[in-house]
Amino acid sequence: MPAEQLRSLQRHERILDAATRVFATKGYHGTLVDEIALEADTSKGGVYFHFPNKQAIFLALFDRLADILRERVESAVAKENEPIARAEAALRVVLDTFASHRRLARLFMVEALGAGPEFNARMIQIRATFADLIRTHLDEAVAVGAIPPLDTATAASAWFGAINEVVIHWAVADNPGRLEDCYPTIRALLLRGIRAQSDLPPDSVARVDTAASATDADGDLGAR
């Protein structure tokens, strides 16, 4: 890599690191580009050379965290052979990753409300990606008989929602414990939820599936 290109890349990363600190301290709306430039030890023009505006910096930080999370999850899942073990590995990695990036967790999951439609769309996309990942492994678990048949789309959303709520509670706590210590409890609750389907009468599962199908069929009512 040419020296000038390397310096540009290093400056780009330095700006993002500085932005993480400033955003985490002042929040998205309270942060000025001038403050990011000062923290990054560069000029305001130097920041704008890499990013057209504050929102672009924010989105780049979000993408950075999402990429880290995705890579770690894929690596952990690839080491497991059983579908439930893969889902458990994904859960564990998500908690471990947020545990080591508390500033970013608080920033994106708590303080980013109102950051704009582009950020909201990106957040929805990321949530859907990870919910689909969980659903894939739950589908595999159903297929091999590891868990009883169930509405895996709803179960995956519930899993993601539970993780999301635990991370938010930890991120805003004044004296948070270790996020990764929550793993055994969350794991037990989530696995108990999907395995409890085997204790339901057969027609109960059928009714859930029928209701889910009806919801899918009427899903466009809100747009009419």
Named regions from a protein language model:
Residues 2, 93-100, 131-132, 136-143, ...:
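C-terminal peripheral helix-coil segments that are non-catalytic and often amphipathic
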Residues 3, 61-90, 134, 138-143:
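Amphipathic alpha-helical linker/stalk segments
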Residues 11, 54, 61, 65, ...:
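Hydrophobic/aromatic residues within well-ordered alpha-helical segments
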Residues 14, 18, 22-56, 60:
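Helix-turn-helix
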Residues 60, 74-103, 155-159, 183, ...:
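Hydrophobic alpha-helical connector segments
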Residues 67-70, 117-144, 153-157, 181-184, ...:
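Amphipathic alpha-helical packing segments from all-alpha helical-bundle domains
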Residues 99-120, 135-136, 168-172, 203:
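Amphipathic alpha-helical segments used for helix-helix packing
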